[in-house]
Amino acid sequence: MQAEQTRCAAARGSAEMESLWHAAPGDEEIPLHPPPTPGAMSLESDSSLDTLAEKIECDLMDLLGDMGPPCDIDEEEDQLFAEALPPLYSQPTENPPPPNAANSIPEQAGKQPAEGKTNTERNERPMRRKRREDGDVGQPNPRRRTHARSRSPRAGSTSSQQPPSSSGGARKPCVRREAGDRETSEKPARGKYCAPFPRQAPHQCQSPPAQTASQKPPPRPQRPPSTTAYSPDRTPHDHQERRHEGAGKMIRSVVTKQDARKPPRRVPHRGCGTGRHGRRTPEKWGAPPSMVVPLKFTREYWEKHRNELKKPVWRDYSRSACTARDPARAHDSGAECPPTEKRDERRTCAPSQPRWLREDRNAARFFDKAKDAFGGLALPTDDMCTRNRDLLRAMADEVVDDDDCEDLDLTRQMCFPTMIGPQSRAAGPVGARMDSWSELCRRAAFLKARWSSQPSVTRVARAVRSLYLTNCSFDELLEACDETLTWMLWHQFEDERLCPHDPIFSNIYALVQGLVTRLGAVLHCHLAASKSPLADPTRTSELPLQSATCPLTLFLTFADRFARVMHGHPHVTLVGHKIVDHEGVLRTLYLPGMCARKIPVVLDQHANVCRKEECRLLCAQLLGKQYTVGKFLCCDLYA
């Protein structure tokens, strides 16, 4: 009976509160309690009034907004309210049991709603809130913040006494939380579940602006794909997508922020990509070609001017009258300039097939591809040796010619005696070989003056002498040894200072290396047999020229002394001749031409006394001048 009266009172109180809410204007104060009636006073008791006050207070707090969680709500009511909330707002314990049918359904069935609180009444508040947001009910003023929650005696209440709370203590005033504040650890613990405030679903608790901000923006309308492969209103990335679609797989291009800011560029249609660079492929429409190949390097130009393009660019050729490009020059010289085809046939002849190619089928099948490699069987008919000899003579003329040169041919023949051309206008034959000491002194003085005053002549002479010593024969190598000792002897005779960087002294090392290479094991065996100090590899002191036992050891001792003196002074340009030969022993032991005449005799004597087959064989090969003994195969199929 008591429960029935409580429910009836709660229903009447809720109806009266709703009527008062509809009747109250938006900016006026809302009365906390309706005026008491005599019928209601007779039926209400202390417990029913307490329940009604709690109901009205919750309704007011729902209308006023988020004022903070209540501090003394019953634990049973919290558990029931947590059931009504979605799973997102129910905070379980640290290790909740896994949800399954075995442990969740019996627990829900065993729970009973609390007395005076039904699920229908709890669900009415969200529905009324929803109707107010839709516009059915007048919206309250959000700026009104009145009536802090407290349990002090209310004005107009029929009961002046306050019933004790479930916790046994007095109510504490709730403090309103501002938007954006975080919950601190000072919030009191409230049982197994802690339900947030206000007690509505998350989509109902938010204000209309917050709901609008949380919603996802509608998807942007996509442009339908174009049916044509290339259109002027599409970007280069769209064209790339269309090209990938044809392969059966859509590959979208990665568009960066910088590309997104660029305005769309109009792309020409297929076949319209022409301009000053010529026709281009669709892939290169966006940028000019990286390199424009000139007409000079086309295949047709190369086939037509093959011989001209194959010439080294550093060679300054003097064209003959028949090959001159200027017809006037050809006419003045009395020769007729032949056409290009005849000139090509004269320069490069294509002979008929060799006899082995016509008769030997096995060889023709075996060399089917090799006969066409690197230009095939066509060979140049020009005399390569004559052409390069003329080129070397032209380079010598260039370095020799100066203001003091009266006769170019004579000056060239004096500086480079072996460079004697067929058009020489010299009075007499000029060569490197001389039979008198006075003639040698005149030639040596001329070379000394030229090498000291013209560095270009010195540079060219040094280079050609180094190549000569590397490729000369054994007899020429012995003559080079005589040339070095004679040059030293002339400096002693004229009391001239030595120049370590002249063409003769600067190539002493190359001369010694040539001797060691050609003599090989014979040199080591001869030095050991004659007990020469040169055979000691650990020697650190200089050897005197008096220690020489033969012309070969004399030259090697002189080269050793000269190298040791110049090793400590690499940048010295002039050195006294007494540093190398202080006592002048060389002029007492050496006569010009001794090396070329006496060293072969020394090798022959060593071959007679040595028992090693290697020494006898090597000496016989060098002295017998049978340089063709080492050739075993010589086949020339181009003939």
From Swiss-Prot:
Q: Is-annotated flag, keyword Zinc?
A: yes
Compositional bias of type Low complexity: which residue ranges? 153-169
**Protein location:** Host cytoplasm; Host nucleus
What are the recorded Gene Ontology BP terms?
regulation of DNA-templated transcription
- Listed GO CC annotations: host cell cytoplasm; host cell nucleus
Q: Do you know which InterPro entries this protein is assigned to? A: ICP27-like
Q: Name one GO molecular function term.
A: RNA binding
Keyword Repeat belongs to the record? no
Protein purpose: Multifunctional regulator of the expression of viral genes that mediates nuclear export of viral intronless mRNAs. This immediate early (EI) protein promotes the nuclear export of viral intronless mRNAs.
Name of this protein: mRNA export factor
State the organism named in the record. Answer: Psittacid herpesvirus 1 (isolate Amazon parrot/-/97-0001/1997)
Taxonomy, top ranks, is: Viruses, Duplodnaviria, Heunggongvirae, Peploviricota, Herviviricetes
